[in-house]
């Protein structure tokens, strides 16, 4: 049921485009009706069947009932907020804590202006960007691990 459009290789315009490495829109299998009517619905229905099947076969547990009068011993944020939570917890001045969190996007915005090389180059040829990236990832992991510890070990992780 698919429609196949064959190229007219005697057409001089098409031959000129093919010589330049272009012309892929003039031949081959068109998206309508082949992809849009036959392939996409199969993929969408297959994905829907997988999601419904998994939710029926392995439902997620509800857990224990919430008690509004029982406060947990330690309230921690989700794991992706651990570095910022630890930063706010460790810095005594809250204004400095908020400004240090605002310094992260400002620092990321300044990296392209500090290092003005071709953005399509190998990342290992961009030493400033790679140094900032590696340092910030290590620092975020360090702060994230420290957020799970008591406040007196939050920065040193109990190593020093």
From Swiss-Prot:
One biological process term in Gene Ontology: photosynthetic electron transport chain
Membrane topology value: Multi-pass membrane protein
Keywords, sorted A to Z: Chloroplast, Electron transport, Membrane, Photosynthesis, Plastid, Thylakoid, Transmembrane, Transmembrane helix, Transport
Transmembrane segments: 36-56, 95-115, 127-147
SUPFAM superfamilies reported in the protein's UniProt record: a domain/subunit of cytochrome bc1 complex (Ubiquinol-cytochrome c reductase)
Keyword Phosphoprotein: no
Cross-referenced Pfam families: Cytochrom_B_C
Keyword Plastid (UniProt): yes
One term of GO molecular function: oxidoreductase activity
Highest taxon above the source species: Eukaryota
Disulphide linkage map: none
Subcellular location: Plastid, Chloroplast thylakoid membrane
A GO CC annotation given for this chain: chloroplast thylakoid membrane
InterPro entries: Cyt_b/b6_C (IPR005798), Cyt_b/b6_C_sf (IPR036150), Cyt_b6/f_cplx_suIV (IPR005870), Cytochrome_b_C_euk/bac (IPR048260)
Subunit structure: The 4 large subunits of the cytochrome b6-f complex are cytochrome b6, subunit IV (17 kDa polypeptide, petD), cytochrome f and the Rieske protein, while the 4 small subunits are petG, petL, petM and petN. The complex functions as a dimer.
Function: Component of the cytochrome b6-f complex, which mediates electron transfer between photosystem II (PSII) and photosystem I (PSI), cyclic electron flow around PSI, and state transitions.
Family statement drawn from the similarity comment of this UniProt entry: Belongs to the cytochrome b family. PetD subfamily.
Protein name: Cytochrome b6-f complex subunit 4
Native source organism of the sequence: Guillardia theta (Cryptophyte)
């Amino acid at each position: 049921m698919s429609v196949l459009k064959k190229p007219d290789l005697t057409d001089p315009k098409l031959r000129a485009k093919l010589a330049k490495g272009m012309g892929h829109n003039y031949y081959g299998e068109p998206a309508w009706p082949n992809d849009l009517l036959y392939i996409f619905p199969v993929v969408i229905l297959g994905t829907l069947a997988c999601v419904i099947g998994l939710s029926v076969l392995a439902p997620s547990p509800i857990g224990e009932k919430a008690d509004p009068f029982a406060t947990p011993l330690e309230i921690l944020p989700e794991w992706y907020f651990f570095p910022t939570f630890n930063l706010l917890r460790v810095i005594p001045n809250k204004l400095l804590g908020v400004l240090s969190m605002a310094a992260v996007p400002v620092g990321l915005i300044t990296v392209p202006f500090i290092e003005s090389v071709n953005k399509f180059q190998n990342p290992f040829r961009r030493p400033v960007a790679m140094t900032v990236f590696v340092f910030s990832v290590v620092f975020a992991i360090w702060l994230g691990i420290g957020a799970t510890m008591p406040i007196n070990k939050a920065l040193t992780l109990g190593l020093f």
